[in-house]
Amino acid sequence: MSAELIAVYKDEQIIDLESAKVLGLSDGIKALKGTEPIYFDDSPLALEVIRHSCAHLLAQSLKALYPDAKFFVGPVVEEGFYYDFKTASKISEEDLPKIEAKMKEFAKLKLAITKEVLTREQALERFKGDELKHAVMSKISGDAFGVYQQGEFEDLCKGPHLPNTRFLNHFKLTKLAGAYLGGDESNEMLIRIYGIAFATKEGLKDYLFQIEEAKKRDHRKLGVELGLFSFDDEIGAGLPLWLPKGARLRKRIEDLLSKALLLRGYEPVKGPEILKSDVWKISGHYDNYKENMYFTTIDEQEYGIKPMNCVGHIKVYQSALHSYRDLPLRFYEYGVVHRHEKSGVLHGLLRVREFTQDDAHIFCSFEQIQSEVSAILDFTHKIMQAFDFSYEMELSTRPAKSIGDDKVWEKATSALKEALKEHRIDYKIDEGGGAFYGPKIDIKITDALKRKWQCGTIQVDMNLPERFKLAFTNERNHAEQPVMIHRAILGSFERFIAILSEHFGGNFPFFVAPTQIALIPINEEHHVFALKLKEALKKRDIFVEVLDKNDSLNKKVRLAEKQKIPMILVLGNEEVETEILSIRDREKQAQYKMPLKEFLSMVESKMQEVSF
């Protein structure tokens, strides 16, 4: 079955076998020229077809089990597929095995999946009395509506789909949730069931293993177990509390970045947390981003709590006159921002209402865009390398609605492409995916579980400099508008630390571990030596803890291991008398002895191994 053709890819579109027949191709799909064949396997294009058909298999099974069920949409998404529907029956996650069993029954029937195309009038008549399908049709322009059938079940859909349910053997329903119709909170709540599907048994097995591993590595779970952060309902949702260990981890990353930023010619700046609404009106945030902002009134004047740091940095730029000799100007700030996120999307540190960006804005001439972006790419590579992340870049180009001259856009986009080319970085292009004011590069990192995360962005901005009338004096002594480059590599410390926690499963590398060394005195008489060693390590900027509770040695060692501390030193008579230390090294997965002076020298060296 693995060699069977299920569709082709042509002009950035998947065309399935049934669609080829509907197109009137006498030889079916083989008559299509200039296409990439899609075979039944676990490749991304094949999985899109497989998962789309599995969504229909889910809907067919739901209809059989709950005859009053009505269906909205069932798309393929990054984590598999889902279907939104409603029924008078009460459904919980306990019902998923029953639904899954019914899906397997239909799959074994080897039902042919066929397609027909209806006019709008025909489609409205076909789904008469189905308000959810009518809602779907109201969002579709044109007069052609695809309808796929398998057995007695049919559904409005543009495809693509498999030719038969016999292909669907390796799937799993993963969770049940609620979802507002069309994502609008003013509409009724529907039921959403998620699932995953693969061509092969191995693909499903590997995925389910990753899901279980992801549960173990969930940063919310690790945050509690390792004492990194917490949330408190009395404070409010989406507002994290950084506990001492988490704050130590975060500060270490901040300090490493600050050192690197200063060496790279960035200047630290700091803007206020609240700014008059007048300035948000100039920037365009008031008209285009107001629903995501928080506002307050002071002395009858409206203020907006900043959702971004760019306006503050613009005002820093405007605080002095500038000539071409001053450029580029690189300002950075660990800026605390607030954004109104709906409670349903809040998720640990990954999605919060208050967060801190590793934000920087570069003011430069148009000719300096490429060199500045190139330097940012170099910086990005060093950071990702230090944290053992692989990453990819995506270049987003001019959208249909945008400002600025075509030549300016072409030049700016070309500068980004040349910078990527200079660093030999393979990148994807998101045509039309840029902001209305300039092209951008998105940084997407891949973690240990092969999940991709959107983190940093490099954004060329030709809009805000114009709105705020920014200028510098050029070589001809004329006023010229600078380009503004928005740049955040981590994205936010909260999000990055969440991803970092899951990437390492809490086993942070030595240079950022919230506790790097645990000292375990065997009994009271070894405590003085432990405190002396602790002070020596603290002077070397090492995060160290003495585990001196009245517990057994084994219990203290297990505690240190549970806390995922990279180095554990057990201190007894021999260590105190000889000053030769017994070290349990997590990274080396070894136990060894080392003289005290040599050990102190080693940890100093380890702290110097990583730089950005």
From Swiss-Prot:
Name the source organism: Helicobacter pylori (strain G27)
The EC number(s) given in the record are 6.1.1.3
Task: Check the record and name the HAMAP family matching this protein.
Answer: Thr_tRNA_synth
Reaction equation(s) it catalyzes: tRNA(Thr) + L-threonine + ATP = L-threonyl-tRNA(Thr) + AMP + diphosphate + H(+)
**Record bears the keyword Zinc:** yes
An example Gene Ontology CC term for this record: cytosol
Cofactor binding summary note: Binds 1 zinc ion per subunit.
Q: How does it assemble?
A: Homodimer.
Alphabetical list of Pfam families matching this protein: HGTP_anticodon, tRNA-synt_2b, tRNA_SAD
Cofactors named for this entry: Zn(2+)
Protein name as it appears in the record: Threonine--tRNA ligase
Tell me which family the UniProt entry assigns to this protein: Belongs to the class-II aminoacyl-tRNA synthetase family.
Report the main location listed first in the record: cytoplasm
Q: At which positions is Zn(2+) bound?
A: 310, 361, 486
